[in-house]
Amino acid sequence: MGDMTNSDFYSKNQRNESSHGGEFGCTMEELRSLMELRGTEAVVKIKETYGDTEAICRRLKTSPVEGLPGTAPDLEKRKQIFGQNFIPPKKPKTFLQLVWEALQDVTLIILEIAAIISLGLSFYHPPGEGNEGCATAQGGAEDEGEAEAGWIEGAAILLSVICVVLVTAFNDWSKEKQFRGLQSRIEQEQKFTVVRAGQVVQIPVAEIVVGDIAQVKYGDLLPADGLFIQGNDLKIDESSLTGESDQVRKSVDKDPMLLSGTHVMEGSGRMLVTAVGVNSQTGIIFTLLGAGGEEEEKKDKKGVKKGDGLQLPAADGAAASNAADSANASLVNGKMQDGNVDASQSKAKQQDGAAAMEMQPLKSAEGGDADDRKKASMHKKEKSVLQGKLTKLAVQIGKAGLVMSAITVIILVLYFTVDTFVVNKKPWLPECTPVYVQYFVKFFIIGVTVLVVAVPEGLPLAVTISLAYSVKKMMKDNNLVRHLDACETMGNATAICSDKTGTLTTNRMTVVQAYVGDVHYKEIPDPSSINTKTMELLINAIAINSAYTTKILPPEKEGALPRQVGNKTECGLLGFVLDLKQDYEPVRSQMPEEKLYKVYTFNSVRKSMSTVIKLPDESFRMYSKGASEIVLKKCCKILNGAGEPRVFRPRDRDEMVKKVIEPMACDGLRTICVAYRDFPSSPEPDWDNENDILNELTCICVVGIEDPVRPEVPEAIRKCQRAGITVRMVTGDNINTARAIAIKCGIIHPGEDFLCLEGKEFNRRIRNEKGEIEQERIDKIWPKLRVLARSSPTDKHTLVKGIIDSTHTEQRQVVAVTGDGTNDGPALKKADVGFAMGIAGTDVAKEASDIILTDDNFSSIVKAVMWGRNVYDSISKFLQFQLTVNVVAVIVAFTGACITQDSPLKAVQMLWVNLIMDTFASLALATEPPTETLLLRKPYGRNKPLISRTMMKNILGHAVYQLALIFTLLFVGEKMFQIDSGRNAPLHSPPSEHYTIIFNTFVMMQLFNEINARKIHGERNVFDGIFRNPIFCTIVLGTFAIQIVIVQFGGKPFSCSPLQLDQWMWCIFIGLGELVWGQVIATIPTSRLKFLKEAGRLTQKEEIPEEELNEDVEEIDHAERELRRGQILWFRGLNRIQTQIRVVKAFRSSLYEGLEKPESRTSIHNFMAHPEFRIEDSQPHIPLIDDTDLEEDAALKQNSSPPSSLNKNNSAIDSGINLTTDTSKSATSSSPGSPIHSLETSL
């Protein structure tokens, strides 16, 4: 059989690649078709064709133990024959395609048409042209030369349209290039572990070749197809390819097929790589998706698939999963593997593509548009907060612009016809028709000009520039942004749910305490004090029952700490062995990994790991280690001082917990219990019956492992809290350990009112009798929850979802989450921003995340917040500037056209203004670097309008100044400067000095206003930090230089006439007035301008003092801020005291006995400090109609201050009691949705 297949296959091989005749014993096609089989089918095929997996290894000239020799020629040959492990990216759009796309802009198309008509008419000389009888409504005749110049305006409009298009296309092109760079960086970071020449090495995924022996472990995303050759308890989530959500158990004799793009959910093992790149299962799907190319894009569904499918431009195994995900979504059963998205959300998400106008140009290497991709992975976010607000604003402005331009055209046409045919009683002569048409075209161009200026085309540009700039800079701050909008969403974050290990701590585990042989050692015990039997068991238990890939290596530099490789907890235990002056290597070489009989790997359900070995006498021994409270429950014996097992009763266990484990945990140590159990050789136990096997253990020792808090974390958390962001810690550790670490980090402060819950208790509280999660139950818990311990990934997801869906606070919460494990995927996807760990994170977590923290450090998250807020501010600055220009230009063009029948600002000039104002200003204002002061204000949240009242004040204030001066110049300018008036000039008259001065002054005012626009919170010093931004200075000076050229040499095309020096001085002087005027505006207190409140505001339920605080605190400097805050606190206090006096009798009721007396000043301060605890005490502003209600309400409010008598140490049980007693009693008074809900936890 073997011979036949061999010869048969050689003939095929000759056909396929004659040059590589007998290189390897199987062809690419054979392996590819083998990988398409599943389960038993595949096992049968392997047996029939090859014999077994080892035979395939021999044919591929590789060793299951040693791997490939790893020589360059061999690897090269394999790449040539079997292909490289990378999928070619979709071709980037060419510059011409981008130009074509930029031309699709509607306003530009209208302008092009107008310009072409204008050009055509200027070359057409109708017979009645010289006819005196035709319209002379404009007064004054043209001389010959001028008539010739009619074409200039049309040509100039076309030219400026081309400029705008080229600039847009160039921006898109550079952004795409940058994005590809980012993508390739993500790829290079993607590494995988293989065995070459007997050494375990990590290589980039692209370097993997057929025949490699790869080591797979929990959390990996398989980068290629392969056959399982050895391992333990390996379970794979194949839903990305098959749509089946059950995990598939892999074994050599039942199902050895490992497929690229699938996730390792449990266990570890080795695989022989059999297909890479386009020949792997994921690669085949990609090729199918990419094949249809452009036609598919048109069809919505397929376009979506393709967008995601081609996300993998190269070897990036991680990106593959997204593709595979979407492929699964679209190809298999249309069901996303993350079933947590409810219908309403997915609707919101589907609209994303339509609304995400800013992201349009971003055709990234990640395939399709960014928004295409978002549509595809439905489980990704809804439209980002900023995009939503911008889209809304752009639509509103666009509508206003359309209306204005239509009115302008109608008025001009009516004015002309009435003036010509009614007032002057001119007859309509056929030969005059072309002349009239020319007038109408001119009016139409004026109308379009108004529209062009009204629509802020610069908005999407400003957003993309700002985001792209931030993303680039964030790389330096260790934030690798995968989804552009995550960067801006981060600025709005109100809550961060962070992992403990590795993010808040250094993830360098060391054993510092131990309990061995009935003695609790507060430091590493002296080896001689431990019984030799116990010592031997301990060394074996640690060395064998931990992943063999975990090692402690000598330090790289002299005097540095030893390097920890692999699982950090296991490294801590191995370090303990070394500290006991023992060595674990001999034990491992005696009992190599292949000889391990059975392994129960660690997972979030078991919370322990066990390994079974066969002893020389054929009996079995199982070593176990895991979280002490879990493993101790399974122990029935414990080793005493003499190394003999003694009975370990529940009573002893409780005592041990009290005396050993709790003190360790309160020092912030993780406690790990190491145990063992012996089994007889016959009858052999049923290894699949885990409950019986993992029981009746004998405890060897309990160790306390320290994972020190990163030194920079407490400061970072303080910054977050100051910035109004609540930090919560979600960890799998014991509650005492978690609380101790939370206090060290500054997440909780002793004496505060907060909750620390265990996963079980959390679940008990949020579920009703039927076991369903209720949002209002979550709402009672999350505002105070600071630590969630012993939590499963599901708890994390539930918490994140609960906070995001909560309508309990004024502003809907924006939540960021950090995660590193495979099972953090759902929480990372659900969060508004998901952070994955770059070093410790699994591929699966990185895939689900929006931002990768390349240094796993919490303080990098604070940097992300800073950048996010900066993006928001940059866009607000640009908006403030842009809208001022728009308001002024539209009003000038509109009134000018209506009064003088001609716009003082010509179409070409408007386009120039539009170009500099839009493109350059967006560049200048969008690249302001962030400052620490950004972290001194509260998050904007979801409902805050883009244009605050201060900005509105600035926009209108500057518009008034500019309009006043422009109209002054328009109507009395000729007298001021003693020049000819430019009003009512005939059709093709030469440019006048008068209108040139108006244009020049207009541009000068914009230039100086650009400096004003740098500050949007009412700061006085607009020059602050201006030299830190060279781009800004360059653009302002550059624009000024170009303006000089346009005015002095622009001539006809720009309708400019050269100006004298004194005229220039006046223009600049009026422009400088902007800066002075800016100071005047800053002096007007925003709080007085109540009428501005409506602008751009979405919802507003706050009461007045609070709103003052929110609005003004951001907009006045800090000294004033403290003063203002003091006043408001006083008002607040007085208000509250009034209410309390009114209802003082209510406090005597038994319900509230024993609780604290009315709040002290500090508790009022506490209310202020935590935005999410703010209570809407709007009662004082409401006429007292329903007394009873108010009394109860006020009474509750009275007690809402943290009662310090209770809950000092804040154990979960304590607060549990408070909660239950209260809820039962206050149930009567709280109707769902009332603010009282927020208080129940604190009573």
UniProtKB/Swiss-Prot annotation:
Q: What is one Gene Ontology biological process annotated in the Swiss-Prot or TrEMBL record?
A: monoatomic ion transmembrane transport
Chemical reaction(s) catalysed: Ca(2+)(in) + ATP + H2O = Ca(2+)(out) + ADP + phosphate + H(+)
Q: For side Cytoplasmic, which residue ranges? A: 1-94, 174-390, 462-875, 927-946, 1010-1028, 1083-1243
What Enzyme Commission number(s) does the record list for this chain? 7.2.2.10
Q: Where is this region: Disordered?
A: 1-24, 334-381, 1194-1243
Q: Which InterPro entries match?
A: ATP_Ca_trans_C, ATPase_P-typ_cation-transptr_C, ATPase_P-typ_cation-transptr_N, ATPase_P-typ_cyto_dom_N, ATPase_P-typ_P_site, ATPase_P-typ_TM_dom_sf, ATPase_P-typ_transduc_dom_A_sf, HAD-like_sf
Task: List all Low complexity biased stretches.
Answer: 1196-1211, 1220-1234
Q: Where is the active site?
A: D499 (4-aspartylphosphate intermediate)
> Main localization of the protein?
membrane
Activity regulation field:
Up-regulated by calmodulin which increases the affinity of the pump for Ca(2+) ions.
Alphabetical keyword list: ATP-binding, Calcium, Calcium transport, Calmodulin-binding, Cell membrane, Deafness, Disease variant, Ion transport, Magnesium, Membrane, Metal-binding, Non-syndromic deafness, Nucleotide-binding, Phosphoprotein, Synapse, Translocase, Transmembrane, Transmembrane helix, Transport
Phosphothreonine modified-residue sites = T1139, T1188
Q: Which residues cross the membrane?
A: 95-115, 153-173, 391-410, 444-461, 876-895, 906-926, 947-969, 988-1009, 1029-1050, 1061-1082
Residue ranges of region Calmodulin-binding subdomain A?
1123-1140
List the GO terms this entry assigns under cellular component, sorted alphabetically: apical plasma membrane; basolateral plasma membrane; cytoplasm; dendritic spine membrane; extracellular exosome; GABA-ergic synapse; glutamatergic synapse; intracellular membrane-bounded organelle
Tissues expressing this chain = Mainly expressed in brain cortex. Found in low levels in skeletal muscle, heart muscle, stomach, liver, kidney and lung. Isoforms containing segment B are found in brain cortex and at low levels in other tissues. Isoforms containing segments X and W are found at low levels in all tissues. Isoforms containing segment A and segment Z are found at low levels in skeletal muscle and heart muscle.
Gene3D superfamilies attached here?
Answer: Calcium-transporting ATPase, cytoplasmic domain N (3.40.1110.10), Calcium-transporting ATPase, cytoplasmic transduction domain A (2.70.150.10), Calcium-transporting ATPase, transmembrane domain (1.20.1110.10), HAD superfamily/HAD-like (3.40.50.1000)
Q: Which domain of life is it from?
A: Eukaryota
Record-linked NCBIfam families = ATPase-IIB_Ca, ATPase_P-type
Describe the family membership recorded for this protein in Swiss-Prot or TrEMBL. Belongs to the cation transport ATPase (P-type) (TC 3.A.3) family. Type IIB subfamily.
Q: State the associated disorder.
A: May act as a disease modifier. ATP2B2 variants may exacerbate the severity of non-syndromic sensorineural hearing loss in patients carrying causative variants in the CDH23 gene. Sensorineural deafness results from damage to the neural receptors of the inner ear, the nerve pathways to the brain, or the area of the brain that receives sound information.
Protein name (record): Plasma membrane calcium-transporting ATPase 2
Specify the species: Homo sapiens (Human)
Encoding gene (name)? ATP2B2
